């Protein structure tokens, strides 16, 4: 099952938590869920160039708090905060409630699965060779502390007549290990030959404590590296200095 299921959904309540955090009765639940989907779709399409990793939605009493994790927060905020005020007003109109916006910077986009997938998709749309784009992403992730990464690209790669799937993997990606901190992201590249799908799995180390917020807390602290990867980087630097 670990090979088939979404790795984030598989670990919910263990070391991952939900992106929508609110409670509602049966009468309101469907409406609020569709509001969340609508807001996420709007933010991802409106701020495509800002490198959106994820959108977390919380609903305190009769209010809405939206946290946007972005690789380029400056593009969202705009000059003197003008753009973020416009975005806040649009989201308030969608929810018919007071909306608060928080922008969180993703310090290492090279080890964020969603941003890696989006980057590869943009390169494929610019006609960059898919193998080169995948290899470059793998090397960048491993260099910046990932313990393992796997990337698959599916579709009419390189304009081939028959669609196929190509993949690269480096390091460990233990999908069955529930304590493993595995980030997963997808993206679609709209090429001249059709749509290509990209999937990315990134293994960032193990989380030993049973804490649904552990993965998010690690990301917020900018500690995307696990202890094993830090030791490996230290040994690599020591060997380079001795050479």
Swiss-Prot record:
Keyword Ribosomal protein: yes
SMART domains in alphabetical order: KH
Domain of life: Bacteria
One Pfam family cited in the UniProt record for this chain: KH_2
A biological process from GO: translation
Gene Ontology cellular component terms for the protein in this record: cytosolic small ribosomal subunit
Family affiliation: Belongs to the universal ribosomal protein uS3 family.
Function: Binds the lower part of the 30S subunit head. Binds mRNA in the 70S ribosome, positioning it for translation.
Entry protein name: Small ribosomal subunit protein uS3
């Amino acid at each position: 099952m670990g090979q088939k299921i979404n790795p984030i959904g598989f670990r919910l309540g263990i070391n991952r938590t939900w992106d929508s955090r609110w409670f509602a009765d049966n009468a309101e639940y469907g409406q609020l869920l569709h509001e969340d989907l609508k807001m996420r779709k709007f933010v991802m399409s409106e701020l495509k160039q800002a490198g959106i990793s994820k959108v977390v939605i919380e609903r305190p009493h009769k209010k809405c708090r939206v946290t946007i994790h972005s690789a380029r927060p400056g593009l969202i905020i705009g000059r003197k905060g003008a753009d973020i005020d416009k975005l806040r007003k649009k989201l308030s109109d969608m929810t018919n409630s007071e909306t608060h916006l928080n922008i969180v910077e993703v310090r290492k986009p090279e080890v964020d699965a969603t941003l890696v997938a989006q980057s590869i998709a943009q390169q494929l749309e610019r006609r960059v060779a898919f193998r080169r784009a995948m290899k470059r992403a793998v090397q960048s992730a491993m260099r910046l502390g990932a313990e393992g990464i796997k990337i698959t690209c599916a579709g009419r790669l390189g304009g081939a007549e028959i669609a196929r799937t190509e993949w690269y993997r480096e390091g460990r990606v233990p999908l069955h290990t529930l304590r493993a901190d595995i980030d997963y992201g997808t993206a679609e590249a709209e090429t001249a030959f059709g749509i290509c799908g990209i999937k990315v799995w990134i293994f960032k180390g193990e989380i030993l404590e049973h804490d649904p917020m552990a993965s998010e807390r690690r990301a917020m602290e900018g500690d995307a590296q696990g202890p094993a990867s830090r030791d490996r980087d230290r040994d690599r630097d020591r060997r380079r200095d001795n050479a």
